[in-house]
Amino acid sequence: GPPYDFGM
């Protein structure tokens, strides 16, 4: 989820 949506 925001701010990270890179799927890591």
Curated annotation (Swiss-Prot):
Keyword 4Fe-4S among record annotations: no
Subcellular location: Secreted
Tissue specificity remark: Neurons within brain and abdominal ganglion.
Any one Gene Ontology BP term: neuropeptide signaling pathway
Modified residues (Hydroxyproline): 3
Coiled-coil blocks: none
Cellular component per GO, a single term: extracellular region
Modification type Methionine amide: residues: 8
Record keywords: Amidation, Hydroxylation, Neuropeptide, Secreted
Keyword Transit peptide: no
The family this protein is said to belong to: Belongs to the allatostatin family.
Function: May act as a neurotransmitter or neuromodulator and play a role in the integration of information within the brain. May be involved in the control of visceral muscles due to its ability to behave as potent inhibitors of peristaltic movements. May also fulfill a neurohormonal role on muscles of the gut and heart.
Protein name: Callatostatin-5
Organism (species): Calliphora vomitoria
Record lineage: Eukaryota, Metazoa, Ecdysozoa, Arthropoda, Hexapoda
